[in-house]
Every structure is written in structure tokens, then in C-alpha cells.
Amino acid sequence: MVDSSPAVPASKSVGPTPTPGAFEVQKSKALPFDSFNPTGRPKVCNPLRLLWNLLAAPPVPFLITERSNARVRSLIESLSQDALILNVGAGGKVLAKNVLNLDIIPTGSTHALASVFALPFPDQAADLIILQGVLEHVPDPRRAVAEIVRVLKPGAVFYTEMPFLEPYHEAPIDVSRRTKFGLAMLCQPLTEIESGIHIGPASTLAWVMREFFAALVSGGHPIVYRRASSLVGWVLFPLRYFDYWLERYEHFHRIASSFYYIGRKDV
């Protein structure tokens, strides 16, 4: 989840208060399993219900390949264990033990609550900042990038991803899209190291076709839309596997689902 308001909320830590002046933030504990079953009664496994839930939730229509995951992993592993690495808008994702997860909504892996517009760190503090699927959800992405640049050390690296042809998806709002070159322009305060396709064109096709047919047959009825989306999703999701091959070809940037950008702050 990411910040959807230009207002700058005061940041606060989740869990024990961190040592003043230190950059470590104590990791919050995940909710115990019993908290999801407040009655305390044993749950009965219903095979038909499990099958229905499975059919109601097809695999996602997009493919994030190991090549994409390896880019982020290599950036993290290139730094020492005491480097300050921030994953802003992390949601529940854990990239590595030495990465601090920031978000405006707490999860079991959130280290601190903070807005992307007001990171709780001084100038030139971070060695690496990661934003995955965040910039499209904020009302002022240029302001967000400016805050990232403020917190980066000279010579430090910024990694981000942003959609181009992904269908609308709220988290909690969905604001903007960028071409490969538009994303580079957004990050112009930095010097580009590398950029390219993050999620390929086959995922674009699978996702757009799912949304099109679900919207077409639903007539605007939300329940019919959800069921149609699930049914069509099961039929179309295999298309995404073509991206293992297609994302290697740069000319597919014209119809890519999303792009990544890696930039360095000038010394």
C-alpha cells in the first residue's frame, strides 16, 4: 500500500521505539494465527469451499521473472550488512533481513510507518532506496522522487518500477502511467544506470483481455464482473509465460506492462 494523499503525516515506528539517532527501527511482530479465529473453535475444512475459493482466485495475469527479481537482489547484495536500505511502500514484502520496510499501513513485516513524501531520515542517509509499484499510486510522483533524492547519499542508488500499460488497480488509488522514457524523465535528478522492461507484453495482453471480457459480460454488475474475471483469468493467465522470452527484446517496450529504472545520485 502506498500514500494516496499529498498531506504529510507524521511518521511513527511500529513496535518498540528506536534508539534516538539510530537508523534501525525495531521490527514489528506478526499477528498470532489465533487472532484470525477469535471464537477459538476449531475450523472445519470444507473441500467444496476450498475448491470454490481456488477457482475464484486465478493466478495473477502478469509475470515477474527471476531476471527481474535478480536485479533487486543484486543491488541489495552489493552493499554491506550495515548499509541503510529502504523499501518504501513495501506492503508485506520482505526483500532481505537488512532491508527496512516502510509503509503508511502496518503489516507483520513493517518496520516504520511513514509517508513517501516525508521519510523519517536525515539528508544523505540511505545507501539504496527501493520503490516497487508505488509511484503510480501517489498524487505527486515528482515530489516523491525529490524526497528520495534528499535521503540518498551521494553515489547511492535508487531502484523503482512503474506501469505503462497495466489496467487500473487501486491501492488505494491509481493515478498515473509512464513509458520507459517518461519514467527516466521523472527520475532526471539522478543519473541513469539502467532501465528496461520489468513486466513484458504478454502480461499486458493477458491482463487487458481479462479486464475487457469481464467488463463486457458483466454489464457493470460487480458480482458478475468478479466471477467473469476469475473465469476468464483461468483461461488467459498462461499467456503471461511468453514474457520469459519476449521481455528480452527491447522493441517490446512499446507494449510492455511496466518498466524498471535504476539511477545513481551524483557525488
Language-model region placement:
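Short, positively charged low-complexity motifs
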Residues: 3-5, 13-17, 22
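N-terminal cationic leader/targeting segments used for protein routing and processing
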Residues: 13, 28-30, 266
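Class I SAM-dependent methyltransferase Rossmann-like catalytic core
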Residues: 25-76
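S-adenosyl-L-methionine-dependent methyltransferase catalytic module, highlighting the catalytic core
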Residues: 142-143, 147, 153, 157-266
